[in-house]
Amino acid sequence: MKNQTYHNEQIVKNTAKLRNVLKDFPDFALDFFTGIENKTSALTRLNYAYDLRTFFKWAVQETNLFRGKEVFDLEVSDLEKFHTTHFERYMSYLTSYTDENGEIITNGERGKARKLAAVRSFFKYYFRREMIKVDLASKIEMPKLHDKPIIKLEEDEMYKFLDTVENGYGLSGHEKGFHKHTKVRDTAIMTLLLGTGLRVSECVGLNIEDLDFKINALKVTRKGGNQVILYFNDEVKLALYNWLEERACNPILVDEPALFTSLQNKRISTRAVEKLVKKYAGIVTPLKHITPHKLRSTYGTRLYHETQDIYVVADVLGHRDVNTTKKHYAAISDEIRRQASKAVTLRK
């Protein structure tokens, strides 16, 4: 698959996973996934399949609606047997349940909202095509989502984080053994994430040919497959250049297109980068639970503070809806709150 882009490889993998999950679905349900194919990604359809599988298993195993039936046996007319109370019970069930592997699964408000959205889309599809007479799933209100504070690295934490990545401060003896082989690569990855706000999937999907050092730019494939050109500063350029110099010394990687590779000489995975961020950030700020997405938030926050232009931030981060950006980055900053607290005095 080396001749394919990372984005295309992921489409192939997710499509294969989707087809495997759909083997246990009722025949009529396949129409839904075919119907939404042109306006959703393979990953979105796969997540829909996972969420709908949970719903169907609950309906067959936890209710009296379909006694003696398996999920595979359901027919489109069975969708009309659901009442609003069934959907409400399902939402309650999602709070905590045991899956087929005996693992306890819990869902907060966001997990419930995502799973309900999948069910509502499913019922809406068949109602619009007049295959069912009523769509009661649409009557169920989505869970109220409470705003979450932006978790990010403060400026001093960011400096310490990069120093830790580069020098291995705080690592165990075992970790230092690996670090001497990966520190240049890790420094390039973390500097790139903090210096551009890339998603972790966009970062690991980069190929060497996507870089242009003449103009300090890189070509990124966004969610949905759109390609954009992003620019980086000289600090990011130096970190990338150092990694490419070291990478060039490994003859095994001559035919490997991926920019960032693992110790197994393959494209590094998103999971591997997540573990690296957790390891280094855990030394600097253990209470914040920093993830690659939090590094993205760090960049977005700093960019907004520097530009005060929410549209620039939305464009650079690849947000399709500027309201998403406004929600997260246009709030009053901690620094402004601190200054405001000193503005009112109680005693002269």
Q: PLM features: what roles do these ranges have?
A:
Residues 1-348:
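Conserved catalytic core of the tyrosine transesterase superfamily
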